[in-house]
Design a protein with these regions (language model features):
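Beta-strand elements within well-structured catalytic alpha/beta cores of enzymes
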Residues: 1, 24, 122-128, 167-170, ...
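Active-site-proximal alpha/beta segments of enzymes that process anionic O-linked groups
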Residues: 1-157
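Second-shell loop/turn segments in exported
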Residues: 10, 35-40, 95-96, 164, ...
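Short, solvent-exposed loop/turn segments at the edges of secondary structure
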Residues: 19, 93, 216-220, 287
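A short beta-strand-to-alpha-helix junction
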Residues: 40-45, 160, 164-169, 215-219, ...
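A long, amphipathic alpha-helix that forms part
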Residues: 107-110, 114, 146-190
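Histidine-centered active-site microenvironments of extracellular/periplasmic hydrolases
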Residues: 182, 187-234
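Membrane-interface soluble catalytic domains
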Residues: 231-354
Length: 354
């Protein structure tokens, strides 16, 4: 992370892995009311930024398979020419129900990318799953488990030592992947995005009370963007800009120098035109709370009749709705407008609508 750009306020637009994949690929938050949008035949066809990568070979790599939540259909239906590589493709053995481990998956990915024509560009999504129950951590050269104190586990939202070490294992695997990429050569012309499908539970204690009361932890993940220094694309550091999964593909296209049409809600995080109007919408199925993150503020509609406003860095965690009525009214209206727009776009952004 020290050699990358870390976005501290990056969020999943909706919770569960299937909703995260849909939101990232389509650029529209998955707010399908009952089941996930991936299972809804009326919304699986979308116009996506991924198809603007003309001339790129496209891959989706997963240690297990995509035979769940209709994910295979979402991917194949929306990204033209996509090769989906699953557990049967890999030489490494399965470790658990999620297929091969993150370490082995990334090792296989490195071999694949290293074998390609370096003059031909590629776009790849690698879905890792070792940091997921049952938290399988096999013996791996260079990695050793560590025991955290119970206080640290509680402060950072971990439920067990196994969960904590599986996170460390995935982090180790990603570090090894970057090292392999450098040795293989393609590193020097590749942009890496590292982010999560969703966050931990709501039990974190190491954050300001304003953040805790906003109930953002289940959707909060890091975003790390990394590229070789000689490309001159990334200035290592930290950013507090609000960002979310829908922004990933527009940002990748912008950094890659691709001129693209954007029918989604995602925005290029490096496009300065949007710096004064960056908000993150977080929703989900019916009954899920709605959040709107705007700078250091979070509007929260808990769907139970309570509407609140918090400042994320506020150590008191006080509800500021009454103290800042204009800001509260503005963010409330914006959240309601975005929610209505997203629900419309789910059904009205088909490729056939060009």
């Amino acid at each position: 992370a020290k050699e990358s750009l870390l976005f501290h306020r990056f969020f999943a637009n909706a919770r569960t892995t299937a909703r995260a994949i849909f939101s990232t690929i389509t650029g529209i938050p998955d707010v399908n009311l009952s089941s996930t949008a991936s299972r809804n035949p009326l919304v699986v066809d979308q116009r996506v930024v991924g198809n603007e990568f003309t001339g790129y070979d496209k891959y989706y790599l997963i240690g297990g398979n995509t035979a769940w939540a209709n994910i295979r259909s979402i991917l194949g239906q929306n990204i033209q020419g996509l090769r989906i590589l699953e557990e049967d493709y890999w030489k490494e053995p399965r470790a658990d129900v999620w297929g091969v481990t993150d370490y082995d998956l990334l090792k296989e990915a490195d071999k694949l990318f290293a074998s390609r024509d370096p003059q031909h560009p590629f776009l790849a999504v690698i879905q890792m799953a070792s940091y997921h129950s049952p938290y399988t951590v096999p013996k791996t050269p260079g990695f050793s488990e560590s025991e955290a104190s119970q206080e640290d586990l509680s402060n950072y939202g971990f439920e067990s030592q196994k969960e904590y070490n599986s996170m460390r294992y995935t982090d180790f695997a990603v570090g090894e992947f970057i090292r392999w990429a450098k040795a293989s050569g393609y590193y020097h012309n590749t942009i890496f995005f590292i982010f999560g499908d969703h966050g931990l539970n709501d039990k974190v204690r190491n954050m300001p009370r304003g953040y805790v009361n906003s109930r953002l932890a289940p959707w909060h993940t890091p975003l790390i963007i990394h590229a070789a220094p000689e490309l001159g694309l990334i200035t290592p550091g930290e950013s507090m800009l609000p960002a979310s999964q829908v922004d990933v593909f527009p940002t990748a296209a912008g950094l890659a120098g691709i001129a693209y049409n954007n029918w989604t809600l995602g925005r290029d995080l490096f496009d300065r035109r949007y710096d004064g109007s960056r908000q993150v919408y977080i929703g989900g199925k019916g009954g899920e709370p709605i959040h709107l993150v705007d700078g250091d503020y979070c509007y929260l509609d808990n769907r139970a009749g309570e509407l609140r406003l918090f400042r994320l860095s506020d150590p008191t965690g006080e509800d500021l709705a009454a103290q800042e009525p204009e800001r509260f009214a503005r963010l409330r209206q914006m959240a309601e407008d975005m929610d209505a727009t997203i629900r419309y776009m789910l059904f009205n952004n088909r490729k056939s609508a060009k």
